[in-house]
Amino acid sequence: MQSARNEQRGTGPESPHAASPTEGFEVLLITGMSGAGRSHAAHSIEDMGWYVVDNMPPKLLEPMVDMMTASKSGFHKLAAVIDVRSRDYFMDLSSVLSHLDDLGLKTRILFLDADDNVLVKRFESVRRPHPLQQGNRLIDGIHEERRLLENLEERADIVINTSKLSIHQLSTKLYEALTGNGPTTVSVHIFSFGFKYGIPIDADFVADVRFLPNPYWVPQLRELNGHDAPVSEYVLSNDKATQFLDAYEKAIEIAIQGYAQEDKHYVTIAIGCTGGQHRSVAMSEALASRLRSHGLSVSVSARELDRKTQ
């Protein structure tokens, strides 16, 4: 990381204040007791947009950061999982993390723990030996691992005891700890479509608004679409459209609250009419506006607008 260090220290003669390529890059070390949920944590953290590497020796952290910043991969968060099978590398950890801190990297340690009796039950349920058991009792392996990791737990930035947590609850705690945003937020994507071109297979909800009067049969509206004010006004002025939006808004709001509790980060809503040009487009935009009023992040697209109106 010589070039990164030079830029950060301002040794470049032409741009003494040039930003380091590692500026804003984050490193998270995932460690803790075997059976405490490291694998589940890694999957959840990957879903949050981190690049996750399993069983990485600490000495490879710096070259990995170099490679990711040089390749402009789009990832600016690296999470590395380290367990007791790489315990020979722990002696390198302190110096490596100190060096990364000197480079201006935001580096944190996540330590996952669980009570001994819970760990015993988890290992027995999967009928696997503890990695440090070595022919001894299961509890002996757990005690040895706890001894090895004692100092690492003390210097951890985030410690989570998973004894009483479900997988979803662990994911929620990780999201809160790593983002500082409180409970899981759910992003909503709404898209309009035409039933004549097929029902989408990737939607969580599919709504049929073909019960509304069709602007296609109004000559002055036929060549327009649901983004145009005359069409939107025609569709939304119908009492049934308002009743539908009132009911659907409430249903979606309840579902999103449940999705957040289950750690689902996004929901896709498809709204269809015959050709996907008029009613579904106008209703998608109207629903999006309502959901945004609740503070939700909502995006909208129209699947069929590139098709010629028929």
Swiss-Prot record:
Q: Which SUPFAM superfamilies match?
A: P-loop containing nucleoside triphosphate hydrolases
The reply on keyword Magnesium is no
Q: Which UniProt keywords apply?
A: ATP-binding, GTP-binding, Nucleotide-binding
Question: Does the keyword field hold Nucleotide-binding?
Answer: yes
InterPro entries assigned to the protein according to its UniProt record, in alphabetical order:
P-loop_NTPase, RapZ-like, RapZ-like_N, RapZ_C
Binding residues annotated for ATP, in chain numbering: 32-39
Domain of life of the source? Bacteria
Mention one GO molecular function: ATP binding
Outline the segment boundaries, as ranges, of region: Disordered.
1-21
Sequence positions that bind GTP: 83-86
Q: Give the family this protein belongs to, as stated in its UniProt record.
A: Belongs to the RapZ-like family.
Annotated function: Displays ATPase and GTPase activities.
What protein is this chain from? Nucleotide-binding protein BLA_1368
Organism in which the protein naturally occurs: Bifidobacterium animalis subsp. lactis (strain AD011)
Q: What is the lineage of its organism?
A: Bacteria, Bacillati, Actinomycetota, Actinomycetes, Bifidobacteriales
